[in-house]
């Protein structure tokens, strides 16, 4: 269990939660492992199936503490919430921001600047770790270009302008992506992004990773009390969780791209784990999906220090922390939305 931003994250699948006076009691078998005072909490995010006592749920509802149930993999299941206007006011403000471009632009700028800076960091780290495997001049040029793009994004005067900056930065970043692949270049190569459908193994891996990341971001947004279908940078479309796509932008390179590269460069998923369809589409087969999902869950359990909070957390909690920070900004509790910028 971990408490961040007045939110209790329960990651251990074998814990059962109950009410102990004015505390949340975490039980493992017949033993209480920890007690957390309810008075210090705004939300409880429970990743597991053991559940919680009706008395605890009732106490949370009475105190306007949101209790969110998710699967161990992070899929949103349900949210217990009492008769409170908190979520209504949060969502109404979210809807206003989505309709007022100047306000939405303030958030979108930080998200895209964060995305570009993270892409730059991925390239800088690779250049540092593999200086003899790449064209140093090309890397340095793109790294500088991304730095300039991040500055430009922070000053964009419209959402369309920002989308153009983001698109150009993505082209620059992906122009070097093939150089980041170090093993089995016969089967694993990157000649450009293709996604609907993927036409090579690397794009198949990227598309699957982005799908999982978008799913995690959507669950995080719902858990934070916002509407995942009302976006800021991504325009609203029926059935599209636009805010999840917004939130995942800053996480694509450091969360999904690095994960895909680790699978390929460490030979975790070989070429035989793909189906090559007659129409040229390339998909992961059952064995490949099983390996991918297993490693994805392992990666989510690795730790890092959150750049804004300065505390160690699991990688898998990053979308949830960012969603909570975004909700706090929308409520007016923060002066600005702090994007996740990997160091």
Feature roles, as predicted:
Residues 48-121:
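A surface-exposed, charged beta-strand/loop segment in the N-terminal or early-internal portion
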